[in-house]
């Protein structure tokens, strides 16, 4: 039997890595998959559903542990019973030292940025929001302080000029599977040369919330475009219109010669829904009004044509 691997993860981002590890037999044996508990995922009233990682693990015939409280001693005992040589983590929770120190070959994490850049919960989103041209994935040994452990290896990739967070996250999950495979091979071969993170280049990627996903229209069009695509499709950038929230999923810079009005002002031109930034206009391509289904910008614009007053997003 090869090295015993315990895998921990929950969302779709972690699934390609789990599948890659499962395919690495006999060099590596996935002895346990730890994930979140079944819960309603479509809406509060929908029936409980398994996590994407649990679904994949069951398809692969792997043993699953649904973890509720990862800080409990009982959880540490359950993981210890699997006798892991190494623990692989991808988009899971913060683990206590009691768990991190169980495997003799260490516990490592797959992170969706080029560390030490974008430490935190939303690295993919903030890389796009900030207009970065490049990002990547990093594997590093976990320690008590979040996202600060020694780097094992990383892979880089360009960010497309119109690529959104949903698309980039999916792409990074596939790239990351290869990074995890290489990391495990390096560990098995004793070829890891851990590198300390340079604190001079450390930046944060804070958790997304209602406040930091609201659009400030008093910005250049390119910044607005990056902000909107950096939050698509979830949780989505939003603004206020007519006293209600409006989610914006997709937009693009609009090349028209007319000078922009006050930032946030709406204009309908040839059926297109335009909004003023500080240096031009941005066209809204996909929106969702509060309590309604998503629709394209042109359809939303049709409902505004009869209104004669100046319309603005706040």
Swiss-Prot record:
Enumerate the catalysed reactions.
L-methionyl-tRNA(fMet) + (6R)-10-formyltetrahydrofolate = N-formyl-L-methionyl-tRNA(fMet) + (6S)-5,6,7,8-tetrahydrofolate + H(+)
Keywords (alphabetical) are: Protein biosynthesis, Transferase
Question: Which GO cellular component does the record give, naming just one?
Answer: cytosol
Protein biosynthesis found in the keyword field: yes
The UniProt record lists the keyword Zinc: no
Q: Where does (6S)-5,6,7,8-tetrahydrofolate bind?
A: 113-116
For this protein, the record's InterPro entries field holds: Fmt, Formyl_trans_C, Formyl_transf_N, Formyl_transf_N_sf, Formyl_transferase-like_C_sf, Met-tRNA-FMT_C, Met-tRNA-FMT_N
The domain of life is: Bacteria
Pfam families from the UniProt entry: Formyl_trans_C, Formyl_trans_N
GO MF term set: methionyl-tRNA formyltransferase activity
Q: What EC number(s) would the UniProt record show? A: 2.1.2.9
Family assignment from sequence similarity = Belongs to the Fmt family.
Q: What is the purpose of this protein? A: Attaches a formyl group to the free amino group of methionyl-tRNA(fMet). The formyl group appears to play a dual role in the initiator identity of N-formylmethionyl-tRNA by promoting its recognition by IF2 and preventing the misappropriation of this tRNA by the elongation apparatus.
Q: What is this protein called?
A: Methionyl-tRNA formyltransferase
């Amino acid at each position: 039997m090869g090295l015993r691997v315990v895998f921990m993860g929950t969302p779709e981002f972690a699934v390609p890595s789990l599948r890659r590890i499962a395919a690495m037999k006999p060099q590596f044996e996935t002895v346990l998959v730890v994930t979140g508990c079944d819960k309603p995922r479509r809406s509060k009233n929908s029936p409980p559903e398994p996590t994407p990682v649990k679904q994949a693990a069951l398809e692969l015939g792997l043993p699953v542990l649904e973890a509720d409280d990862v800080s409990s001693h009982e959880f540490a005992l359950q993981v210890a019973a699997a006798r892991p040589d190494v623990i692989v983590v991808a988009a899971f929770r913060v683990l206590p030292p009691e768990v991190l120190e169980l495997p003799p070959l260490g516990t490592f994490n797959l992170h969706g940025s080029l560390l030490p850049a974008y430490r935190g919960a939303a690295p993919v989103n903030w890389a796009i929001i900030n207009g970065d041209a490049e990002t990547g994935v990093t594997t590093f040994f976990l320690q008590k302080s979040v996202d600060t452990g020694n780097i094992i290896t990383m892979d880089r990739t360009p960010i497309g000029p119109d690529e959104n967070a949903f698309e980039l996250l999916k792409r990074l999950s596939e790239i990351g599977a290869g990074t995890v495979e290489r990391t495990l091979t390096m560990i098995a071969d004793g070829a890891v040369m851990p590198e300390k993170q340079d604190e001079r280049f450390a930046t944060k990627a804070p958790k997304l919330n209602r406040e930091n996903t609201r659009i400030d229209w008093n910005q250049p069009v390119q910044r607005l475009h990056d902000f909107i695509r950096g939050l698509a499709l979830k949780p989505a950038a939003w603004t206020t219109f007519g006293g209600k929230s409006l989610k914006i999923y997709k937009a693009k810079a609009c090349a028209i010669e007319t000078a922009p009005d006050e930032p946030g002002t709406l204009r309908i031109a040839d059926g297109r829904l335009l909004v003023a930034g500080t240096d031009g206009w941005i066209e809204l391509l996909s929106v969702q009004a509060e309590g309604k289904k998503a629709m394209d910008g042109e359809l939303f614009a049709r409902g505004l044509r009869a209104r004669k007053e100046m319309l603005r997003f706040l």
